[in-house]
Amino acid sequence: MARNWKFDPQEQIDYTIEWIKKYFVKKAGPDTKAIIGISGGKDSTIAAALLVRALGAERVHGVLMPCGNQADIAHSYEICNALGIQFDEINIEPVVDVFYGCVGHGDCEIPAVRTNVPARMRMVTLYAIAAIYGGRVVNTGNWSEGWIGYTTKYGDLAGDFHLFQDLTVREVLMMGRIMEEIPRHLVDKAPADGMTGQTDEDNMGVTYEQIDAFLLEDILPDVNTWRNMSQRHERNEHKKCINLPGPFAHGRHYEKGKHGGVFEVF
């Protein structure tokens, strides 16, 4: 990785906006909408703001997908209103419950099922909305999540294009903090899965800053944390079968094993 390279959030914002514009010219059409799941978290919030800057609010359509009662859904309303985008709210809990009943196994109670089925149902919902409105689904995950595998295959890993696959949590935050249209508390809120009541970092047993320090600076945490990180990374290698086009971070050079994405240059 280039040791003298410094991430410039404004440069990345400008580049990402241009990438979005070119993607929709070449891969879609003048009326095609961007369809984005709005969770109220930093990634979907910042991605939505970038899409609005690139395409205009009229071509960005949000989808709110609580599973039952979502305690922080007010944050999803807040960002949609702040950006002036239209949105649908679809509670996926009834469909998820029917699915569990159809499967008919007590094993539906295990955490892997309870975590991954709603994530996949959300992606099914996004593609249904995309078909209705004529749109492309944006993936809002980041490199830090992807590297450690804190994602769901065919759930939040899916989409038509991927805005942050080359950016760590640290870098996405740097971008969001200089975008004045975004309420700051939505940028800085702790990432959470919305189901267990815990943050992502609680669930993983590692902080995003520790992941980013390794990815960007080759700084290793303590032995136990590194063992946890590396084991999670290795166990989740199978998720890398899904590669989407997306912008890259300028000037970055990669070491084998750290990254695997598809960066499309127009």
Language model: regions and residue ranges:
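Conserved G/P- and acidic residue-centered "switch" motifs that form tight phosphate/ATP-binding loops
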Residues: 41
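ATP/NTP-dependent adenylation/nucleotidyl-transfer catalytic domains that generate, transfer
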Residues: 1-36, 58-61, 68-69, 79-94, ...
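Short, well-ordered alpha-helices that flank and scaffold nucleotide-derived cofactor binding pockets
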Residues: 49-53
